[in-house]
Regions:
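Active-site-adjacent structural elements that line small-molecule/cofactor binding pockets in enzymes
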Residues: 1-168
Length: 168
């Protein structure tokens, strides 16, 4: 699934609307499942994280050109970026679109952590999530072992399933 989703938009717009729907239906957070959401960029160190952020430029420029996602950009003060990307898309300037997205834009929309920080990050910042997913290199036996170790730690993270401040 592609698109633009940020933790801020999730917390300020989406989850409050889900809460309203739950209240109207007489249901509770435990009646639904929410997958971990928002751009989360994970790497071994700041350099790898920055490279992965920069690798998101093409996708963000494409989705950001689509007016459907301008509300997410607006939440972050990036509405002008969305308008510029849309105009460039109408002109077929795909490379220029990618180059329009800056590292500052990416840092505004994404959250980052290292692989070692991931379990703590999920517990502190994705407390609403019933499910989480992540990717990392698994091409060698050592990488696979590291992945399995991190996977066990992530699976051990207990979350409330209730967004902070949106209890029913």
């Amino acid at each position: 699934h592609g698109g633009i989703m940020s933790d801020r938009y999730m917390r300020e717009v989406l989850l409050p609307n889900v809460r309203t729907g739950l209240q109207r239906a007489g249901r509770d957070w435990s009646d639904i499942e929410i997958s971990e959401s928002g751009y989360l960029v994970i790497g071994d160190d700041d350099s790898e994280i920055e490279q992965k952020l920069l690798g998101m430029r093409r996708a963000l420029s494409f989705y950001g050109s689509t007016r459907t996602y301008h509300e997410v950009l607006r939440t972050h003060g990036l509405e002008e970026l969305g308008q510029k990307l849309h105009a460039l898309s109408l002109q077929g300037k795909w490379e220029e679109m990618r180059d329009t997205v800056t590292l500052d834009d990416l840092n505004e929309l994404a959250q980052t952590c290292t692989y070692d920080e991931l379990p703590q990050f999920l517990g502190e910042h994705r407390e609403y999530a019933s499910r989480s997913g992540f990717g990392m290199p698994r091409g060698t036996p050592a990488e696979e072992e590291r992945f399995q170790d991190l996977l066990a730690k992530v699976q051990a993270v207990e979350t409330s399933g209730v967004p902070k401040g949106l209890e029913l």
